[in-house]
Amino acid sequence: NLNREVAKLNYRIHTDAIQEHLTVPELTQSQKSFIYANEADMLNVVLFGKTAREWKNENPNKKGNMRDYASIHQLLVLANMESYNAILIGQGISQPERMEKLHDLAARQLNVLDSVNLDDLPQLPDIKKE
């Protein structure tokens, strides 16, 4: 799924910001993992309304995680949220304030994207390698 792969690449930008600004060398690997998971769950709550664990508990028979079942619009907004959160982390903005800003961003973007008919967008030509 190309959309999921783009989101994964953008996640790297997000995790680099977390590593640079929210962790210190003195933390154990377990403590660092908690910080990364906490940031990922904040994005999940803002976009999907629940943590990864809550989603998994509600969907025990589904493989993967909630992001694997996200719409193209949700994945695009998630990628944008990760980039924006990385910037906000770099600016030293607290998590509650970042959460509020990210919620506003997600709501605006989903509203715009939900009004777009993908069939109305220009299509790229099908280029086959020979």
Where are these regions (language model features)?
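Positively charged, phosphate-engaging catalytic surfaces used for nucleic-acid and nucleotide handling
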Residues: 1-130
